[in-house]
């Protein structure tokens, strides 16, 4: 059978027309040096700062140094799998982590991989760990409270949604306890929580997770763990990864709380990386951009304006001090970035005042606007009276003769201190806090022994639940202590006081 020449040309023309000329190009480089979790790579001329690269063993790395001939990459995996001469590919993507509701109730590493043995996670997508903070025009002032459930904080150092409030103090003063209590108190309040553990002992993280599970808080919480055994690179990216997971919810109009525990160890991890990358050291051997390290992280916390969904991301960074020195490099940096600090003191802790908050050095710069009306009314004089008591306490130690007015301040101060003491994992509802403060500030417990003040107030709250539930309901609904409710409350306190006195006489 003969083939006509014109058929051949048409078949060839068709083949040429349908031929796929597209070429897939990949930029590759080679590892020329590897050690201490750092790889130097030759050949990735167009690599971008913060970009993910992939080694031939499947391990990923992140570009942190751009030099004349080489690129410095931190290895985010097993560094032993990275050898000299290995081929490295660019991914063209900035370092990103999985995000979404599938992460709630799970413990993950900073790459978003599950480490709790509960199987794979269903993600909603991925988000870059570094993203610009919302600009001023997209923000609105902090005006909604984030209740911690801790009376001393909610009354004197209130935190608003979208605020950054530093928790600072020496080791073993209860910093993590305040953060965990705050997470537990968000139950049924529609706030998603992210707890980022940086450089903590694995046993400590396991204990926090068990506590959160015990109190039913894990269902709305994600734990991002970069324990002390992880590489400095993973500890460095952990808070950014946790922040990205929180931002996903914030941009959906939800409220998020992120705890960074703690940024002192984060700065140490970054110092380790910087020195290994041969960057010049500065004060306390930290690199020159250690301020920017924390400012770009904490500036991502915001209360978005209503046209952008009205979501919020509240940050509770934790910083550990040495011997109470808050004027060291990292503490002063983070104090200047945040909107206030809760300062915990060893002396108070060991004298049995827990949470050990030094009210004189603690402050909330923007939270006052977020307090509910009822709390503003009853707690206005609380800080002042407590400060006066602490001042006069010094003179009382000398046993000198004190006048009646001074004795009155001391008596009242002792009773205020008693209601600010609170057992761990027992957050108080805001209406209970208002009633407790009202009772003490209006001198209803002046004639009660100091050791009996807390049992009296707790008994009163229980009595109100049973006999006058409408008082608490009114405060809860109106967020105010109306004249009518106040009259009812006064009568109820006096009624309970009579019962209490009669019980004591028996």
Swiss-Prot record:
Q: Does the keyword Membrane apply?
A: yes
Q: Which reaction does it catalyse?
A: ATP + H2O + 4 H(+)(in) = ADP + phosphate + 5 H(+)(out)
- Name of the protein: ATP synthase subunit alpha
Lineage of the species this protein comes from: Bacteria, Bacillati, Bacillota, Clostridia, Thermoanaerobacterales
Q: Give the GO cellular component terms, alphabetically.
A: plasma membrane; proton-transporting ATP synthase complex
Q: Which InterPro entries match?
A: ATP_synth_asu-like_sf, ATP_synth_asu_C, ATP_synth_asu_C_sf, ATP_synth_F1_a_nt-bd_dom, ATP_synth_F1_asu, ATPase_a/bsu_AS, ATPase_F1/V1/A1_a/bsu_N, ATPase_F1/V1/A1_a/bsu_N_sf
Q: How does it assemble?
A: F-type ATPases have 2 components, CF(1) - the catalytic core - and CF(0) - the membrane proton channel. CF(1) has five subunits: alpha(3), beta(3), gamma(1), delta(1), epsilon(1). CF(0) has three main subunits: a(1), b(2) and c(9-12). The alpha and beta chains form an alternating ring which encloses part of the gamma chain. CF(1) is attached to CF(0) by a central stalk formed by the gamma and epsilon chains, while a peripheral stalk is formed by the delta and b chains.
Keyword ATP-binding appears in the UniProt entry:
yes
By its UniProt entry, which CDD domains does this protein fall under? Answer: ATP-synt_F1_alpha_C (cd18113), ATP-synt_F1_alpha_N (cd18116), F1-ATPase_alpha_CD (cd01132)
The chain's disulfide connectivity reads none
Q: Where is the site Required for activity?
A: 362
List locations, semicolon-separated: Cell membrane
Q: Cross-referenced HAMAP family, in alphabetical order?
A: ATP_synth_alpha_bact
Q: State the source organism's domain of life.
A: Bacteria
TM ranges = none
Listed Pfam families: ATP-synt_ab, ATP-synt_ab_C, ATP-synt_ab_N
Protein's organism: Caldanaerobacter subterraneus subsp. tengcongensis (strain DSM 15242 / JCM 11007 / NBRC 100824 / MB4) (Thermoanaerobacter tengcongensis)
């Amino acid at each position: 059978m003969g083939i006509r020449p014109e058929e051949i040309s048409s078949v060839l023309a068709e083949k040429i027309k349908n031929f796929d000329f597209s070429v897939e190009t990949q930029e590759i480089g080679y590892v020329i040096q590897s050690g201490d979790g750092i790889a130097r790579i030759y050949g990735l001329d167009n690599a971008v700062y913060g970009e993910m690269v992939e080694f031939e063993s499947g391990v990923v790395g992140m570009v942190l140094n751009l030099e004349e001939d080489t690129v410095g990459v931190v290895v985010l995996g097993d560094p032993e799998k990275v050898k000299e001469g290995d081929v490295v590919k660019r991914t063209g993507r900035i370092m990103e982590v999985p995000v979404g509701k599938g992460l709630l109730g799970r413990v993950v590493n900073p790459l978003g991989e599950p480490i709790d043995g509960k199987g794979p996670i269903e993600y909603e997508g991925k988000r870059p760990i570094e993203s610009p903070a919302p600009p001023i025009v997209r923000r609105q002032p902090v005006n909604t409270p984030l209740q911690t459930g801790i009376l001393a904080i909610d009354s004197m150092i209130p935190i608003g949604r979208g605020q950054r409030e530093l928790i600072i103090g020496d080791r073993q003063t209860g910093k993590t306890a305040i953060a965990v209590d705050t997470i537990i108190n968000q139950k049924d309040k529609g706030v998603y929580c992210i707890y980022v553990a940086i450089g903590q002992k694995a046993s400590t993280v396991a204990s926090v997770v068990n506590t959160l599970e015990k109190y039913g808080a894990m269902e709305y919480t994600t734990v991002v763990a970069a324990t002390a055994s992880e590489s400095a690179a993973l500890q460095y990216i952990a808070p950014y990864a946790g922040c990205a997971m929180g931002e996903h919810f914030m941009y959906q109009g939800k409220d998020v709380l992120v705890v960074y525990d703690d940024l002192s160890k984060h700065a140490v991890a970054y110092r380790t990386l910087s020195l290994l990358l041969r960057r010049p050291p500065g004060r306390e051997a930290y690199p020159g951009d250690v301020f920017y390290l924390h400012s770009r992280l904490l500036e991502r916390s915001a209360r978005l304006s209503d046209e952008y969904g009205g979501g919020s991301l509240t940050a509770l960074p934790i910083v550990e001090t040495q011997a109470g020195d808050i004027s060291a490099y990292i503490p002063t940096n983070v104090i200047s970035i945040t909107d206030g600090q809760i300062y915990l003191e060893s002396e108070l802790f060991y004298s049995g005042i827990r949470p050990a908050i030094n009210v004189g050095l603690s402050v909330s710069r923007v939270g006052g606007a977020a307090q509910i009306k009822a709390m503003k009314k009853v707690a206005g004089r609380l800080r002042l009276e407590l400060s006066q008591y602490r001042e006069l306490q010094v003179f009382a130690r000398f046993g000198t003769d004190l006048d009646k007015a001074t004795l009155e301040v001391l008596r009242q101060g002792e009773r205020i201190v008693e209601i600010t003491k609170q057992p761990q994992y027992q957050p108080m509802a805001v209406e209970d806090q208002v009633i407790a403060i009202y009772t003490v500030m209006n001198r209803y417990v002046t004639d009660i022994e100091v050791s009996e003040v807390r049992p009296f107030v707790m008994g009163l709250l229980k009595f109100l639940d049973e006999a006058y539930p409408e008082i608490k309901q009114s405060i809860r609904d109106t967020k105010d202590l109306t004249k009518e409710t106040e009259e009812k409350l006064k009568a109820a306190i006096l009624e309970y006081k009579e019962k209490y006195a009669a019980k004591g006489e028996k």
